[in-house]
Amino acid sequence: KREAVAVDINDKQGSVYQTEDDPSGLFYKFIPKSKNKLDGEGKLYALSIKGLVNANNSKAEIKIGDSLKTSWVSILDPEATSKKTKLQGIEKGGTTFNGSEGIIVDTNNLNQSEIYFTCKSGGFAGLGQIWRYNPANDYITLFYESKSKDDFWMGDNITISPWGDLIVCEDNDSNACKLIGFTPKGKMYVLGKVSSQRSTEISGVCFSQMERRWG
């Protein structure tokens, strides 16, 4: 099941990246036959990280900032008529991610696309990860992994702020979910926090075109 999609507008092929909200979901790329016709034919792929069956980092061997070589495996039955796309990808070496959620495309200072996505339950502590994929060099980087609920607890929806920082919404069933910012170099800060007597998540963060207020 797909959770979120993001279109790489810098890509001549019009690649569409997709997350899968599943404890063993894959990270997908759809390349349309016609760039401006996303409901038409195309090819579906799943990401494979070299030497890594899953990206959950259960042994804490991957450190924040580590970059890993990737490739893409073909999903031959994208409509899953006989087998789930997840199973097709895993059989070919696709790497699984734990609870992939929000996704956004940004552009770095080299004018290269970078695709950020969250894994709400990923990481050694199970508190969440943020991954950054660079299609120009086919590497994926562990941008952030939480070790403490007080710092970062199950990031979900994400966006890019007008000043270039990554903004992440927490969704952890508590009554104090936070809105967290990350600079491009990974420095984290808290923008706000829910104050409620009930469990409340933050979602759908965006900015107005005027760049002066929250959307």
Spans of features found by a protein language model:
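Sequence/structural signature of beta-propeller domains
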Residues: 1-215
